[in-house]
Amino acid sequence: MGIYIFSWPVLREALLKKKDEPGCDFGKHVIPYCHVNGQRLFAYEYNGYWKDVGTLGSYWEANMELIDIIPDFNLYEEIWKIYTNTGCIPPQYISENSVIEKSIICNGTEIYGEVHNSVIGSNVVIGQGAVVRDSIIMQDVVIGENCVIDKSIIAEHVKVGDNVTLGIRS
Protein backbone atom coordinates (compact mmCIF):
# COMPACT_ATOMS: atom_id res chain seq x y z
CA MET A 1 0.00 0.00 0.00
CA GLY A 2 1.18 3.50 -0.63
CA ILE A 3 1.16 6.53 -2.83
CA TYR A 4 2.87 6.15 -6.18
CA ILE A 5 4.14 8.79 -8.59
CA PHE A 6 5.05 7.73 -12.13
CA SER A 7 6.00 9.33 -15.39
CA TRP A 8 3.26 8.44 -17.88
CA PRO A 9 5.47 6.45 -20.30
CA VAL A 10 6.83 4.23 -17.48
CA LEU A 11 3.39 3.64 -15.95
CA ARG A 12 1.79 2.97 -19.33
CA GLU A 13 4.42 0.39 -20.24
CA ALA A 14 4.13 -1.40 -16.89
CA LEU A 15 0.33 -1.49 -17.01
CA LEU A 16 0.28 -2.80 -20.57
CA LYS A 17 2.80 -5.53 -19.73
CA LYS A 18 0.96 -6.56 -16.55
CA LYS A 19 -2.65 -6.11 -17.70
CA ASP A 20 -3.32 -9.86 -17.91
CA GLU A 21 -1.90 -10.55 -14.45
CA PRO A 22 -4.75 -11.87 -12.23
CA GLY A 23 -5.59 -9.23 -9.62
CA CYS A 24 -2.93 -6.87 -10.98
CA ASP A 25 -1.60 -4.90 -8.02
CA PHE A 26 0.89 -2.02 -7.86
CA GLY A 27 2.87 -3.48 -4.97
CA LYS A 28 2.91 -7.07 -6.25
CA HIS A 29 3.19 -6.57 -10.01
CA VAL A 30 3.79 -3.03 -11.29
CA ILE A 31 6.56 -1.94 -8.88
CA PRO A 32 8.51 -5.24 -9.23
CA TYR A 33 8.17 -5.02 -13.03
CA CYS A 34 9.65 -1.50 -12.99
CA HIS A 35 12.47 -2.63 -10.70
CA VAL A 36 13.40 -5.66 -12.82
CA ASN A 37 13.41 -3.47 -15.93
CA GLY A 38 15.84 -0.93 -14.50
CA GLN A 39 13.48 1.94 -13.72
CA ARG A 40 14.66 4.30 -11.00
CA LEU A 41 12.54 3.81 -7.88
CA PHE A 42 12.49 5.93 -4.73
CA ALA A 43 10.67 5.46 -1.43
CA TYR A 44 9.66 7.94 1.23
CA GLU A 45 8.42 6.79 4.60
CA TYR A 46 5.42 8.89 5.57
CA ASN A 47 4.21 8.65 9.15
CA GLY A 48 1.09 10.81 8.86
CA TYR A 49 -2.44 9.71 8.06
CA TRP A 50 -2.88 7.51 5.02
CA LYS A 51 -5.65 5.12 4.08
CA ASP A 52 -6.07 2.93 1.04
CA VAL A 53 -9.42 3.83 -0.55
CA GLY A 54 -9.15 1.48 -3.49
CA THR A 55 -12.47 -0.27 -2.85
CA LEU A 56 -15.99 1.06 -2.29
CA GLY A 57 -15.92 -0.35 1.23
CA SER A 58 -12.66 1.35 2.18
CA TYR A 59 -13.78 4.62 0.52
CA TRP A 60 -17.01 4.53 2.55
CA GLU A 61 -15.08 3.76 5.77
CA ALA A 62 -12.64 6.64 5.20
CA ASN A 63 -15.51 9.09 4.76
CA MET A 64 -17.31 7.79 7.84
CA GLU A 65 -14.10 8.25 9.85
CA LEU A 66 -14.15 11.97 8.95
CA ILE A 67 -17.23 12.45 11.11
CA ASP A 68 -15.82 10.74 14.21
CA ILE A 69 -15.62 13.00 17.26
CA ILE A 70 -11.82 13.06 16.92
CA PRO A 71 -11.03 11.60 13.49
CA ASP A 72 -7.61 10.18 12.65
CA PHE A 73 -7.64 12.56 9.67
CA ASN A 74 -8.91 15.85 11.08
CA LEU A 75 -10.09 18.30 8.41
CA TYR A 76 -9.69 21.14 10.92
CA GLU A 77 -6.22 20.36 12.27
CA GLU A 78 -4.34 23.61 12.89
CA ILE A 79 -1.13 22.68 11.09
CA TRP A 80 -2.77 20.95 8.11
CA LYS A 81 -6.20 22.45 7.43
CA ILE A 82 -8.04 21.24 4.35
CA TYR A 83 -9.50 23.98 2.16
CA THR A 84 -11.89 23.60 -0.73
CA ASN A 85 -12.67 25.87 -3.64
CA THR A 86 -16.36 25.57 -4.38
CA GLY A 87 -16.59 28.85 -6.27
CA CYS A 88 -19.27 31.41 -5.52
CA ILE A 89 -22.08 29.39 -4.02
CA PRO A 90 -24.30 30.17 -1.05
CA PRO A 91 -23.88 28.61 2.38
CA GLN A 92 -25.93 25.59 3.43
CA TYR A 93 -29.66 26.02 3.95
CA ILE A 94 -31.20 23.91 6.70
CA SER A 95 -35.00 24.12 6.91
CA GLU A 96 -36.65 24.55 10.29
CA ASN A 97 -37.99 20.97 10.26
CA SER A 98 -34.69 19.35 9.28
CA VAL A 99 -32.69 17.06 11.55
CA ILE A 100 -28.92 16.81 11.17
CA GLU A 101 -26.77 14.59 13.34
CA LYS A 102 -23.01 13.94 13.22
CA SER A 103 -22.53 14.88 9.56
CA ILE A 104 -20.43 17.04 7.27
CA ILE A 105 -22.53 19.33 5.07
CA CYS A 106 -20.83 21.29 2.28
CA ASN A 107 -21.72 24.73 0.91
CA GLY A 108 -24.66 25.22 -1.42
CA THR A 109 -26.60 22.31 0.07
CA GLU A 110 -30.30 22.58 0.92
CA ILE A 111 -31.68 20.16 3.49
CA TYR A 112 -35.41 19.75 4.03
CA GLY A 113 -35.26 16.22 5.49
CA GLU A 114 -32.98 14.31 7.87
CA VAL A 115 -29.25 13.58 7.64
CA HIS A 116 -27.56 11.23 10.10
CA ASN A 117 -23.90 10.18 10.20
CA SER A 118 -23.23 11.18 6.59
CA VAL A 119 -20.96 13.25 4.35
CA ILE A 120 -22.90 15.54 2.02
CA GLY A 121 -21.15 17.27 -0.91
CA SER A 122 -21.78 20.74 -2.30
CA ASN A 123 -24.96 21.79 -4.13
CA VAL A 124 -27.01 18.85 -2.87
CA VAL A 125 -30.76 19.06 -2.29
CA ILE A 126 -32.33 16.63 0.19
CA GLY A 127 -36.11 16.73 -0.11
CA GLN A 128 -38.75 17.02 2.57
CA GLY A 129 -39.36 13.76 4.40
CA ALA A 130 -36.15 12.22 3.05
CA VAL A 131 -33.82 10.39 5.45
CA VAL A 132 -30.11 9.94 4.68
CA ARG A 133 -28.14 7.67 7.04
CA ASP A 134 -24.53 6.45 7.03
CA SER A 135 -24.04 7.65 3.45
CA ILE A 136 -21.81 9.66 1.15
CA ILE A 137 -23.66 12.00 -1.19
CA MET A 138 -21.38 13.62 -3.76
CA GLN A 139 -21.86 17.08 -5.27
CA ASP A 140 -24.80 18.23 -7.38
CA VAL A 141 -27.18 15.48 -6.26
CA VAL A 142 -30.92 15.84 -5.79
CA ILE A 143 -32.66 13.44 -3.43
CA GLY A 144 -36.43 13.59 -3.80
CA GLU A 145 -39.09 13.80 -1.14
CA ASN A 146 -39.76 10.87 1.21
CA CYS A 147 -36.65 8.93 0.13
CA VAL A 148 -34.64 6.67 2.42
CA ILE A 149 -30.91 6.40 1.68
CA ASP A 150 -29.00 3.97 3.94
CA LYS A 151 -25.29 3.16 3.86
CA SER A 152 -24.94 4.27 0.25
CA ILE A 153 -22.54 6.18 -1.97
CA ILE A 154 -24.39 8.41 -4.44
CA ALA A 155 -22.23 9.64 -7.33
CA GLU A 156 -22.22 13.28 -8.43
CA HIS A 157 -24.95 14.68 -10.71
CA VAL A 158 -27.50 11.99 -9.75
CA LYS A 159 -31.20 12.67 -9.27
CA VAL A 160 -33.05 10.27 -6.98
CA GLY A 161 -36.81 10.52 -7.55
CA ASP A 162 -39.46 10.83 -4.85
CA ASN A 163 -40.31 7.84 -2.61
CA VAL A 164 -37.15 5.85 -3.47
CA THR A 165 -35.35 3.57 -1.00
CA LEU A 166 -31.65 2.80 -1.57
CA GLY A 167 -29.13 0.82 0.44
CA ILE A 168 -29.26 -1.56 3.36
CA ARG A 169 -30.12 -0.49 6.89
CA SER A 170 -27.58 -1.93 9.29
Question: Which residues does each predicted region cover?
Answer:
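Left-handed beta-helix
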Residues: 9, 17-170
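Conserved nucleotide-sugar donor-binding
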Residues: 3-13
